[in-house]
Curated annotation (Swiss-Prot):
Pfam families: FabA (PF07977). Belongs to the thioester dehydratase family. FabZ subfamily. One of its GO terms (biological process) is fatty acid biosynthetic process. It comes from Shewanella amazonensis (strain ATCC BAA-1098 / SB2B). One of its GO terms (molecular function) is (3R)-hydroxyacyl-[acyl-carrier-protein] dehydratase activity. The gene is fabZ. This is 3-hydroxyacyl-[acyl-carrier-protein] dehydratase FabZ. The lineage of its organism: Bacteria, Pseudomonadati, Pseudomonadota, Gammaproteobacteria, Alteromonadales.
Amino acid sequence: MSNQMNTMDIKEILKYLPHRYPFLLIDRVLDFTAGESLHAIKNVTINEPFFVGHFPVAPVMPGVLILEAMAQATGLLAFKTMSSEPSPDVLYYFAGIDNARFKRVVEPGDQLHFEVKMIKERRGIGVFYGEAKVDGELVCSAEIMCARREISK
């Protein structure tokens, strides 16, 4: 068994995810095992556009964007599991969420760690469990579904 870690820098992430600024919410993948799990990070800075209005006096990352970032990490794991290479003709859509729970706020200067695990896959639909943490402390957890779709041009 190899101890080699599978990582993805931002250049590789951009090949898999269609998201771009200001909606690309994953900065790096620290490790992944196709069909099993993925560990990604998002560095949260005061320069994030959502902090202008959420909230100017006490900036907090919106919970829906924490879930979106978790869904993007899930999409990367789905791509690495259910497809061989990135393709402009294939997308993984956020198809559902269950049991989302928030435990603490995320503020500028925090580094979000996303751990997503594959639960099952059938007919292009994947079910995953994800957690977001800051400094080892649970921020959010959820079950996420994503669906593989070919894009017709």
